[in-house]
Every structure is written in structure tokens, then in C-alpha cells.
């Protein structure tokens, strides 16, 4: 697993990139279920290969976007799944929806650990669909389904 550490204006960001869907889903699920900070799980492509980025910003109220990390360590990464956790609220915030604006082809979601539900959203609606996510295997299945949908569109 390649690790990257970047700083933004308010705190340190801790993110890592891997080619292993299992490792990414396992670490993200463990972090979300066992901490009170927001986590990010992103799946996509870099240099034509499937990649997964996970991380947190050590804050309970926000997590950095990949573009918000100094020195842009994930340059060239093309996301198809962009999920982050909300420890205390369901659905996307206005800020989440603003971050989704203009990013076509990406499935955005907020995971709420209290009810183990993923809330899909876009730049217009904070709750398009709700999907139960009882384990890391559910997260992996969701991700693989989105990879397949993306491959069919190309």
C-alpha cells in the first residue's frame, strides 16, 4: 500500500492508495465503525488500473476531498465511487453536494454508521437512494457494481 501524507490549512490528512479492493474496504469499514472521525473511500482508475484511496482528516465534521490535499498526491486519479462517512448525520450536506457539482460519472455516497446505510447523492439531491451496508463485503459488491456500470458505458 502506498501512503501519502498531505497537509491542508486546518489539519493533517492521512490517505493511502492501494490496488487491493479487500484491503481498502477492510480498512475503511474498520475506521468508520471504530472511530468518531469522517473517513473517505474512493475507487477509480489511475494509469489504467483499478485503484482505491482511503483516508481521514482527523476531524469528526469533515474529510478532505482528494483535490484538497496539498501537493496533489493523487493527481491523475479518476474516481467512479466517492464515499465518506458521517458520524452523526444521514445524507449529504450542502457542502457535499457542492463538491459533487460538475463531476459526471462519479457515484457519491455518505455512509451513516448508526444504521449501516449508504445514502447516494448528487449535486442536486442529498438522498437519491439508500443502500444497506452491513459489512465490508457489501462495500466491495457496491464498488464492483459501479466499476461494471462504468465499463459498460465506455
Identify what each model region corresponds to.
Residues 55-56, 83-87, 100-101, 110-114:
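Short His-Asn-centered micro-motif
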Residues 105-111, 118-120:
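Sequence context surrounding c-type heme c attachment/ligation sites in exported
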Residues 64, 89-98:
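Active-site-adjacent loop/helix micro-motif of nuclease/hydrolase catalytic cores
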Residues 52, 90-94, 117-121:
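Extracytoplasmic/secreted cell-surface and envelope-processing proteins
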Residues 78-92:
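Histidine-centered catalytic micro-motifs
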Residues 41-42, 80-84, 107-110:
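Structural recognition of the beta-strand scaffold that forms the well-ordered cores
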Residues 1-79, 124-154:
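Glycine-rich short-loop/terminal segments
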Residues 39, 103-105, 115:
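A detector of repeated loop/turn-to-beta-strand junctions in beta-rich toroidal repeat architectures
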Amino acid at each position: 500500500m502506498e501512503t501519502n501524507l498531505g497537509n491542508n490549512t486546518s489539519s493533517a490528512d492521512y490517505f493511502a492508495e492501494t490496488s487491493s479492493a479487500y484491503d481498502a474496504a477492510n480498512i475503511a469499514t474498520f475506521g468508520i465503525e471504530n472511530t468518531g472521525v469522517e473517513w473517505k473511500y474512493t475507487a477509480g482508475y489511475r494509469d489504467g488500473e483499478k485503484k482505491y484511496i482511503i483516508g481521514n482528516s482527523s476531524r469528526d465534521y469533515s474529510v478532505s476531498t482528494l483535490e484538497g490535499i496539498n501537493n496533489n498526491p493523487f493527481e491523475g486519479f479518476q474516481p467512479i465511487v466517492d464515499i465518506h462517512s458521517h458520524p452523526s448525520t444521514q445524507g449529504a450536506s450542502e457542502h457535499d453536494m457542492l463538491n459533487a457539482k460538475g463531476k459526471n460519472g462519479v457515484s457519491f455516497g455518505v455512509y451513516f454508521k448508526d444504521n449501516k446505510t449508504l445514502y447516494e447523492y448528487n449535486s442536486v439531491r442529498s438522498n437519491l437512494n439508500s443502500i444497506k451496508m452491513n459489512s465490508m463485503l457489501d462495500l466491495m459488491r457496491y464498488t464492483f457494481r459501479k466499476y461494471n456500470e462504468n465499463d459498460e458505458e465506455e
